Every structure is written in C-alpha cells, then in structure tokens.
Regions:
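Catalytic-core "active-site belt" of small-molecule-metabolizing enzymes
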Residues: 1-87, 94-131
Length: 131
C-alpha cells in the first residue's frame, strides 16, 4: 500500500509534473499480485488523514471500484509484462468530503480472504511558497 499524492498547485501546470514532484511513501511490506489476484475485488482500502488536528476517515472502499491490475498492465506502453520487483499504483478511491490538505496520512489495505492487513503512515510538512 502506498500514496501517489501530488502537489495540488503544480497540478494546474500538469498532472505528470505534480506526481513527479512528490515522493511516493510505500509500506515496507507487500503482497505479491499472485497472492491476491483471484480475490482482488474483495480487498478493502481505507485511509485516515489528520486535518486541522482531527483524525478523519478520508477514503474507504473495495478495490472492485478500480481497474484490475491485468487491465492496467495491458494498457502499459511496454506491454503487459512487468520486470520482477516492479511496484505499480493501481488507482485511488474518491476523497470523502473532497481533497484537502492534512498533517498526517494513514492508509491500509485489508485482505478479508487471507485475514491480513498492510498499513503505512507518514507525516506531511507543508513548505512555504517562496518567490
């Protein structure tokens, strides 16, 4: 589980640019696609954000609402085969209450079939805009 966050102001100039500007925090644990592919739609994603000092539910839902990995890989410019060790972001759920900045982000991916959960969190330091 990881975060593909962006710089919202930079998004006005280009989504790819805004994504390249931000690091991608990723859980130190992972699951192989082969371990979850047969029940992908049942996986549950949840995120909390600390906004103005309050921890709030930010995103929640099943991966059934996202494109399956095989579909995304088939659309890949280099073809569907990914090099060993590749990590791929597969989309995101809508932000409950809309996108808003926060001081902390916590995320989890729960596998109800195998009874396990990946978790990760990070703090956000907003940099001042200087000219």
């Amino acid at each position: 589980v990881g975060s593909d966050h962006t710089d919202r102001a930079a998004e006005t100039h280009g989504i790819a640019l805004s994504k390249q500007m931000c690091g991608k925090p990723v859980s130190p644990e992972l699951w192989k696609l082969s371990e979850v592919e047969d029940h992908w739609d049942a996986l549950e994603m949840r995120a909390h954000a600390t906004i103005m000092g309050r921890r709030v539910l930010y995103q929640e839902g099943r991966l059934a609402s996202l494109r399956p990995p095989a579909d995304l890989m088939a659309r890949r410019p280099g073809g569907p085969a990914l090099p060993p060790g590749t990590v791929m972001f597969c989309g995101t759920l809508g932000a409950l209450g809309g996108i808003r900045p926060g001081a902390r982000f916590e995320m989890e991916l729960h596998d109800p079939v195998r009874g396990r959960t990946l978790r990760h969190a990070y703090d956000i330091a907003e940099l001042p805009v200087v000219s």
